[in-house]
């Protein structure tokens, strides 16, 4: 499945149906009076979080969504039917922004969550509504009100427990493929990973989700390489596993390069718990390994984990370290997802403005 994490979408709710101008006509009733019914309300545009999706690719092929208009009113004071709704189905972790792509409307973090993006227009009143003591036979009715139309942005931030970060070819995809059933592309050239990958790791009966994102290089926050656009996918994680390849000539500099890019991006990434690991250690002899481990320890301020996904060295220790932080964060609630289930202004009932 192809990956898309941002989409621009045009939506329009249905117009309200027009009220009817009608008079009661029955045998032996000369002046039956008005009986025009009200128009039906236009259909709404909703967004719904569904299970089984991890991309916005469907919105590459359809960007326009329009709900149906309400049915017009009819005689015998029959109200028109409401227009059919349109539902945009999105993955967990989707954020909705205004057209400026900056103003957040809603952050959808739970399966089954629904939110009304655009309310249908009210139906117009039929002429029966306007009957009064001074106007026994009104000959006018209201048209239906127009529905709402707007352009919005959908932005996906994958929800994972732990995120893998590092320079290109640091062994992130190999680590993910080794500890989960994910099958990311793995090759010996930079930027093999072009989009985020998710996998479920299990250790001592505990499962958690890992996210692998494309590698960062110096200047990524300014668009160098693939840039830092995928860092949003690790914003929601509880812990980062920072892999530094043992094949780097200067592992300390490699570590600081990625840390600088995380700091430049912001989003609280540098405040997250971080586990540092020297990866691909199977390519070094013992003397070189000690030297680089010491250099990396000096850069990050603590002894790094030593691991090799290819040789299955240190994998269990890394998974247990991740699990411990995830469990601790879950119990403490410090990194829980924000509760944005409060109604937006579009969910609040508006005053009847058909008059």
From Swiss-Prot:
It comes from the Bacteria. The keyword Nucleotide-binding applies. GO terms for molecular function: GTP binding; GTPase activity; magnesium ion binding. It is an enzyme of class 3 (hydrolase). One of its GO terms (cellular component) is cytoplasm. Its cofactor is Mg(2+). Its EC number is 3.6.5.-. Keywords: Cytoplasm, GTP-binding, Hydrolase, Magnesium, Metal-binding, Nucleotide-binding. Monomer. An essential GTPase which binds GTP, GDP and possibly (p)ppGpp with moderate affinity, with high nucleotide exchange rates and a fairly low GTP hydrolysis rate. Plays a role in control of the cell cycle, stress response, ribosome biogenesis and in those bacteria that undergo differentiation, in morphogenesis control. HAMAP family: GTPase_Obg. This is GTPase Obg. The lineage of its organism: Bacteria, Pseudomonadati, Pseudomonadota, Alphaproteobacteria, Hyphomicrobiales.
């Amino acid at each position: 499945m192809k990956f898309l994490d941002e989409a621009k979408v045009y939506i329009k709710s249905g117009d309200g149906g027009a009220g009817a101008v009608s008079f009661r006509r029955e045998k032996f009733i000369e002046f039956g009076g008005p009986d025009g019914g009200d128009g039906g309300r236009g259909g709404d545009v909703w967004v719904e979080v569904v299970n089984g999706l991890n991309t916005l690719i469907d919105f590459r092929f359809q960007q326009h969504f329009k709900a149906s208009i309400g049915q017009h009113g009819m005689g015998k004071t029959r109200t028109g039917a409401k227009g059919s709704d349109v539902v945009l189905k999105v993955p967990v972790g989707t954020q909705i922004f205004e057209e400026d792509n900056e103003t957040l409307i809603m952050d959808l973090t739970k399966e089954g969550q629904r939110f009304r993006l655009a309310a249908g227009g009210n139906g117009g009143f039929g002429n029966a509504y306007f009957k009064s003591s001074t106007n026994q036979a009104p000959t006018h009715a209201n048209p239906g009100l127009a529905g709402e139309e707007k352009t919005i942005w959908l932005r996906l931030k994958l929800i994972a427990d732990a995120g893998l970060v590092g320079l290109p070819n640091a062994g992130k995809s190999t680590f993910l493929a080794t500890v989960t059933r994910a099958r990311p592309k793995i090759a010996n050239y930079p930027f093999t990973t072009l989009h985020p990958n998710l996998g479920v790791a299990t250790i001592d009966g505990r499962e958690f989700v890992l996210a692998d994102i494309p590698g960062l290089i110096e200047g990524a926050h300014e668009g160098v390489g693939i840039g830092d656009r995928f860092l949003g996918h690790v914003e929601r994680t509880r812990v980062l596993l920072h892999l530094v390849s043992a094949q780097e000539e200067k592992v300390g500099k490699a570590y600081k390069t990625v840390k600088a890019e995380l700091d430049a991006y912001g989003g609280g990434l540098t405040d997250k718990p971080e586990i540092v690991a020297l990866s691909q250690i199977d390519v070094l002899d013992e003397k070189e390994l000690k030297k680089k481990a010491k250099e990396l320890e000096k850069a990050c301020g603590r002894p790094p984990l030593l691991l090799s996904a290819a040789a299955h060295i240190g994998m269990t220790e890394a998974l247990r370290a991740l699990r411990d932080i995830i469990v601790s964060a879950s119990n403490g609630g410090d990194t829980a997802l924000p509760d944005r289930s409060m109604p937006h202004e579009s969910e609040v009932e508006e005053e009847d403005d058909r008059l």
